[in-house]
Amino acid sequence: PGPEMATMIERARFAEFYTGPGTNFQDITLEEAIAKATQEKKHIFIECHTDGCVPCKMMKDKVFPHDKMAEYLNREFVSISVDNENGDGPQIMEKYDVQMFPTYIILEPNGELCDIIMSTETDIDLFIKKIEEVKNLK
């Protein structure tokens, strides 16, 4: 198979990961995430990545499947994952001026920005602490 097929397969694997066990990254738009977060009284966690991003893959493989991280994010957030080139990705990257990957955007249930985290923290407790601090800024 050519490079296009390899890219399609990689995207399918990435999508499969985000709907598999671990952190529940929902396949919904930001607008839908805001509506859901408002209804469920949860914050919004946006994971921003790009194809070929090695640190993004490391976080995907080591952090988000972890039971403690998944339990925390699934309980406290409506989580979505966005690619810088697809779906809502380009608009989100522009709106929040995302320049580096991975970047994590934390929003209030109504969609207001809490803050942005740029991190490759693989210590689950430290990463949760960092997210919790940002979530509680307002």
What are the residue ranges of the model-derived segments?
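Loop/turn elements at helix/coil->beta-strand transitions in domains of secreted/extracellular proteins
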Residues: 40-44, 75-80, 108-112
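Extracytoplasmic/secreted proteins, especially bacterial periplasmic and envelope-associated proteins
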Residues: 4, 28-32, 55-58, 68, ...
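Local sequence-structure signature of Cys/Sec-based thiol-disulfide redox active-site neighborhoods
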Residues: 30-68
